[in-house]
Amino acid sequence: MSDLFAPDGGWRVRILDLSGGAQNNIVEEIGGFETLMQANAFARRYVRDSVELCRVPGTTAKEVLEAWFAFGEDAEVIDAGEAGWRSATELGDFVDNPAGSEDRDWRALDPRRIDEDDEDE
């Protein structure tokens, strides 16, 4: 798929609750991403932040990973196929290397926030 042919309403990212607390593990779907690159970056940062929320001082990478699978949230870009970002490709790196604040800042890419900022102007 190409960024030139975004679905109506833009690309959508599905947030999945790994703890099983939500129906079908789906917490929410966030729409309105103008490009696939933005949707992928949002999904990546969202998962990165979720991993960091599971990191407790003194825990090993294995313990962080176990905590994420038990309590974390995953994200996927809907209908992006092979072009969509997948947490499995970077999860090992995420648990091995703590993230800085910019790598976790999914809110800066959230189209819901961007829409709110536009209304304030």
What are these regions (language model features)?
Residues 48-121:
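Short, mixed-charge low-complexity intrinsically disordered segments
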Residues 37-42, 54-58:
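Glycine-rich loops and low-complexity Gly/Arg-rich segments
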Residues 32, 46-49:
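Compact, well-ordered interaction domains used in eukaryotic information-processing assemblies
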Residues 24-41:
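A short, exposed loop/beta-hairpin motif centered on an aromatic-Gly-Thr core
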Residues 2-29:
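Short aromatic-glycine-(Arg/Gly/Cys) micro-motifs in beta-strand/loop hairpins
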Residues 1-2, 121:
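Classical N-terminal secretory signal peptides
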